[in-house]
Amino acid sequence: MTEQEEKVSFGITIPKSLKTRLKIYCAQNDKKIQDVIREALEEYLQRREK
């Protein structure tokens, strides 16, 4: 994804405990939730698209 690429909203449902872990991680690492999720999806797909 490039910085100029159009962004769209993407809603999902996740377990409450996972959301809590994500929020804690983001707070401790000064990251935005949307950035962590985007990075995780990019990494996940890169590993499986080979």
Curated annotation (Swiss-Prot):
Do you know which InterPro entries this protein is assigned to? 56B_RHH, Arc_rbn_hlx_hlx, Ribbon_hlx_hlx
* Gene3D superfamilies hit by this protein: Met repressor-like
According to its UniProt entry, the protein's GO biological process terms are:
regulation of DNA-templated transcription
Pfam family name, one: 56B_RHH
Q: What is this protein called?
A: Uncharacterized protein 13
Organism, scientific name: Sulfolobus islandicus filamentous virus (isolate Iceland/Hveragerdi)
